Design a protein with these regions (language model features):
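Active-site signature of alpha/beta-hydrolase-fold catalytic machinery across serine-
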Residues: 84
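A short, basic N-terminal segment
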Residues: 1-63, 202, 209-213
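Walker A (P-loop) ATP-phosphate-binding motif of ABC ATPase nucleotide-binding domains
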Residues: 67
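Hydrophobic anchor at the beta1->P-loop junction of P-loop NTPases
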Residues: 70
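AAA+/P-loop NTPase substrate/partner-engagement loops
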Residues: 87-133
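Walker B catalytic acidic pair
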Residues: 136-138
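Conserved glycine(s) of the Walker
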Residues: 75-81
Length: 213
């Protein structure tokens, strides 16, 4: 994702927002939050989505009604970026972040009620309300069985959340190291097709350096 090449109208002073983001990064990461030149477009786009800046979103072809699928190589900072976006003083920060490995682990212990928990809401809540989630590291989860029955847990959850998105506008976010082709191989063409409707696609370059080092 690239920064706009021409001057555009903005609803916020993004220089101030980025300064705040850097301070927030230092506070919560314990080190400087560095924004490489080739990643500024992603940061700018993410900020525009979370701030609901319609002017910037229009220029960058971002659909504010969709969630975000953030892809890129291992260690490029996808999870960290979503965690920092969750600190922005905006009503859009209200999402829960859960790793796909954790979800599959819960499924293997508790079974099919976990599919409901992460899609339509807990079966044991009289006021079931779907929540906004960021499913972290899609593709890292292992194949799963419950009492001998195979289940592609994340595919089932995401397909149900697609229906909820169409019905109620409930947002889902994802981070992943997978390519589009790998997503189709693991989760099927049906889900990949629906992902285009559910998500704005933000991607780090393959050359993005590992920020964990």
């Amino acid at each position: 994702m690239q920064l706009p090449t021409n001057p555009i109208e903005m609803s916020y002073d993004y220089r101030e927002v980025v300064m705040w983001l850097r301070k927030c990064g230092r506070k919560h990461l314990g080190k400087n939050f560095i924004i490489p030149e080739n990643e500024k477009g992603i940061i700018f786009g993410m900020l525009a989505w979370f701030l609901q800046d319609e002017l910037v979103a229009k220029e960058m072809n971002i659909d504010l009604t969709k969630g975000i699928m953030l892809s890129g190589p291992i260690g490029c900072g996808k999870t960290t970026l979503f965690k920092l976006m969750g600190k922005i003083p905006s009503k859009r920060k209200n999402f829960m972040m859960t790793s796909t490995r954790q979800i599959v682990s819960e499924f293997m212990q508790s079974g099919y009620e976990i599919l409901e928990k992460y899609s339509r809401g807990s079966l044991y809540n009289d006021h079931r309300t779907p929540k906004n989630y960021c499913f972290d590291d899609l593709g890292s989860e292992s194949a799963s069985k419950y009492f001998g029955n195979d289940c592609n847990v994340m595919a089932e959850i995401l397909l149900t959340r697609y229906d909820i998105f169409k019905e109620k506008g409930i947002i889902t976010h994802l981070t992943t190291n997978l390519t589009a082709g790998e997503i189709e191989t693991i989760y099927g063409n049906r889900l990949r097709s629906r992902m285009r409707e559910m998500f704005n696609l933000f991607g780090y370059d393959e050359s993005s350096w590992d920020k964990r080092r």
